[in-house]
């Protein structure tokens, strides 16, 4: 199949066949929050200016890949009649917002999103629908009358891989890829990653420094398959999360970003977390991690998964700890195993598992300035020291693989010993754990389970590349997923900036996904504004990394915006920006009138000192001289 076959047809599409009467609803017990949810619905349905949702059809009608089409104004051709214009073609951008930004879709959070992948999963014929939940805790929650008013009402029976010859079945995208199968998910991703580049008129781009990465000019379904088969990329798509739109994480693809949300014992609610999730995906979050540690973790997660168009990750040890009333020493393999099954049956797409925290590494943290800062890492370190043996995450790792391959849950192997300050970076504990994660990666791959590796943390700029180089070496090119890293510790309230500096660098060096940091990092639970600020900051970092790598087509949006800037097409400048609302707001603070949107100056320079206007005059003068 050629690229024209993959993504030549753009259509508007109505993926939700609900009527407008099915407006956004909230749980009946929460009527007091109706107004806020309706406000959220208006925010989500409000299409960005000059934009429309389009769907690119693949090789079959049920492959409809969403993108945002930005319409651009024409450019007046200088020196000729005012009726002469240069047409600027529409620009297409990657879109993570799901049907929430489709004006034709009726959104009902109580019913969840359409099951985009259900048909693909079903047609493979290697899964079965269970009679009911098989997790003891899941069953107990379903019978708990006290939480009935919190529960998502439309829960399907879970799917699981069919057994093969008496052995546990395998339905991972890695399993298919290694058998030469190109799944609909892989074709969907190829269209999504390519972003209609074959229609771009300006592909001028500086050569990047790839540090060994290799991305072809056009990403094909076969390239996606080969990268997944090699373990260099993952497609986090649990079979029980059919609502999710396929995406890929790997250093030969666009750098992705993850947004952390979740309640705590001190704040937030199910409504607020769902609102944060939809808000984060609107602004570009490729993945969401639910890090809830407060009340109703099970119910919160169900609402998030059923309404999320992007993969959802969790740290299962958090909920397991809740089940033993916060006493880490009381954790057992049986409790953790049941938690994994509970979450896999809900549809969690990837688990952070801190299996690399070994007993021998814990004493190495004694001399650290900030000790063990990972919540999961500290929990497992406490368990190991109390019981004086290796954690059940490590000793039962193959059992965990057996569970995950039945649902296609990917590993995000957690860096439980990551540094919490610059002083502790790149020490023996951190790198010892990383080497162990490399060994566990090979075990997971033996089971055809997808793996990515988590990384730091707090690292000075001159020490960042050492992290990337070692990860590639000991983890055999498995995707790296890092929290920043923060490049200085002196800026609480601005750690979205301190970390974005490190994120841009490590993304350039080869990290596949960046975990965002909000301005509230180290200070408190982020609200919706903080979530947006973190997302936009990390979209900048990820894009800067793509540019530095020379990712094909990465510079096209920069070129389009720069052209609009030089031609004083103010509306196009706003609309091509990562955050059109803020760009327009800042411009209009001093030049609010409609006439100012065609002015050949801004309030920075005024009408007489605009360098771009002067440059245009110089060019016109030069043309006149040449004509003579």
Swiss-Prot record:
GO process terms (BP): thiamine biosynthetic process; thiamine diphosphate biosynthetic process
An annotated Gene Ontology molecular function: carbon-carbon lyase activity
Annotated positions binding Zn(2+): 458, 522
Reported cofactor(s): [4Fe-4S] cluster
Cofactor binding note from Swiss-Prot or TrEMBL: Binds 1 [4Fe-4S] cluster per subunit. The cluster is coordinated with 3 cysteines and an exchangeable S-adenosyl-L-methionine.
Keywords: 4Fe-4S, Iron, Iron-sulfur, Lyase, Metal-binding, S-adenosyl-L-methionine, Thiamine biosynthesis, Zinc
Positions of region (Disordered): 1-37
Keyword Ligase: no
A GO CC term assigned to this protein in UniProt: cytosol
Gene3D superfamilies documented for this protein: 6.10.250.620, Radical SAM ThiC family, central domain
Protein's pathway: Cofactor biosynthesis; thiamine diphosphate biosynthesis
Reactions catalysed according to its record: 5-amino-1-(5-phospho-beta-D-ribosyl)imidazole + S-adenosyl-L-methionine = 4-amino-2-methyl-5-(phosphooxymethyl)pyrimidine + CO + 5'-deoxyadenosine + formate + L-methionine + 3 H(+)
Any matching Pfam family: ThiC_Rad_SAM
Covalent S-S links between cysteines: none
EC number, as in UniProt: 4.1.99.17
Residues annotated as binding [4Fe-4S] cluster: 602, 605, 610
Polar residues biased stretches: 1-14
Positions annotated to bind substrate: 260, 289, 318, 354, 374-376, 415-418, 454, 481
Biased composition (Basic and acidic residues): 19-37
Protein function: Catalyzes the synthesis of the hydroxymethylpyrimidine phosphate (HMP-P) moiety of thiamine from aminoimidazole ribotide (AIR) in a radical S-adenosyl-L-methionine (SAM)-dependent reaction.
PANTHER family given in the database record: PHOSPHOMETHYLPYRIMIDINE SYNTHASE, CHLOROPLASTIC (PTHR30557:SF1), THIAMINE BIOSYNTHESIS PROTEIN THIC (PTHR30557)
Subunit structure: Homodimer.
Recorded family membership: Belongs to the ThiC family.
Protein name: Phosphomethylpyrimidine synthase
Gene: thiC
């Amino acid at each position: 199949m050629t690229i024209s076959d993959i993504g030549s047809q753009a259509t508007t599409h109505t993926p939700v066949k609900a009527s407008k009467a099915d407006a956004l609803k909230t749980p009946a017990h929460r009527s007091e929050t109706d107004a806020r949810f309706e406000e959220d619905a208006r925010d989500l349905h409000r299409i960005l200016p000059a934009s429309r949702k389009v769907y690119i059809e693949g090789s079959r009608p049920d492959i409809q890949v969403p993108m945002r089409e930005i319409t651009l104004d024409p450019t007046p051709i200088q020196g000729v009649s005012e009726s002469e214009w240069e047409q600027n073609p529409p620009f297409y951008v990657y879109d993570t917002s799901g049907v929430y930004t489709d004006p034709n879709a009726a959104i009902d959070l109580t019913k969840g999103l359409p099951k985009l992948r259900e048909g693909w999963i079903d047609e493979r014929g290697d899964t079965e629908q269970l009679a009911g939940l098989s997790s003891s805790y899941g069953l107990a929650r379903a019978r708990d009358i006290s939480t009935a008013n919190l529960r998502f009402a439309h829960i399907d029976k879970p799917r699981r891989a069919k057994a093969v010859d008496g052995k546990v079945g395998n339905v991972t995208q890695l399993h298919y890829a290694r058998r030469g199968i190109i799944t609909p998910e892989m074709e969907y991703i190829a269209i999504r990653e390519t972003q209609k580049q074959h229609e771009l008129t300006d592909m001028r781009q500086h050569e990047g420094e790839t540090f060994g990465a290799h991305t072809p000019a056009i990403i094909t379904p076969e390239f996606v398959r080969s990268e997944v088969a090699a373990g260099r990329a993952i497609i986090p798509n649990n079979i029980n999360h059919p609502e999710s739109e396929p995406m890929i994480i790997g250093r030969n693809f666009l750098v992705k970003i993850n947004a952390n949300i979740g309640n705590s014992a001190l704040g937030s609610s199910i409504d607020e977390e769902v609102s944060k999730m939809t808000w984060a995906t609107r602004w570009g979050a490729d993945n969401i991690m639910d890090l809830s540690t407060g009340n109703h973790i099970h119910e919160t997660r169900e609402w998030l998964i059923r309404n999320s168009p992007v993969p959802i990750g969790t740290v299962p040890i958090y909920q397991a700890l809740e089940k033993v009333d916060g006493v880490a020493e009381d954790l057992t393999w049986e409790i953790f195993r049941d938690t994994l099954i509970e979450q896999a049956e809900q549809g969690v797409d990837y688990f952070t598992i801190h299996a690399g925290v070994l007993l021998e590494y814990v004493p190495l943290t004694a001399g650290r300035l900030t000790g063990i800062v990972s919540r999961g890492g500290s929990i497992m370190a406490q368990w190991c020291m109390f019981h004086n043996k290796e954690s059940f995450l490590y000793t039962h790792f193959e059992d965990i693989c057996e569970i995950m391959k039945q649902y296609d849950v990917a590993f995000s192997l957690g860096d439980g010993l990551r540094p919490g300050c610059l002083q502790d970076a790149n020490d023996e504990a951190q790198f010892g754990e990383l080497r162990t994660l490399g060994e566990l990666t090979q075990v997971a791959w033996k089971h055809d389970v997808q793996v990515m590796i988590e990384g730091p943390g707090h690292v000075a700029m001159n020490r960042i590349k050492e992290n990337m180089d070692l990860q590639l070496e000991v983890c055999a090119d498995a995707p790296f997923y890092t929290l920043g890293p923060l490049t200085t510790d002196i800026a609480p309230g601005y750690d979205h900036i301190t970390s974005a500096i490190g994120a841009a660098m490590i993304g350039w060096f080869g990290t596949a996904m960046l975990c965002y940091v909000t301005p509230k990092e180290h200070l408190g639970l982020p609200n919706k504004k903080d979530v947006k600020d973190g997302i936009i900051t990390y979209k900048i970092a990820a894009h800067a990394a793509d540019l530095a790598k020379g990712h094909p087509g990465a510079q096209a949006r920069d070129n389009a915006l720069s052209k609009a800037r030089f031609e004083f097409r103010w509306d196009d400048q706003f609309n091509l920006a990562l955050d059109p609302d803020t760009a327009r707001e800042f411009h209009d603070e001093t030049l609010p009138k409609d006439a100012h949107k065609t002015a050949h100056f801004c309030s920075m320079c005024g009408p007489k000192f605009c360098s771009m206007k002067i440059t245009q005059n110089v060019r016109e003068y030069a043309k006149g001289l040449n004509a003579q």
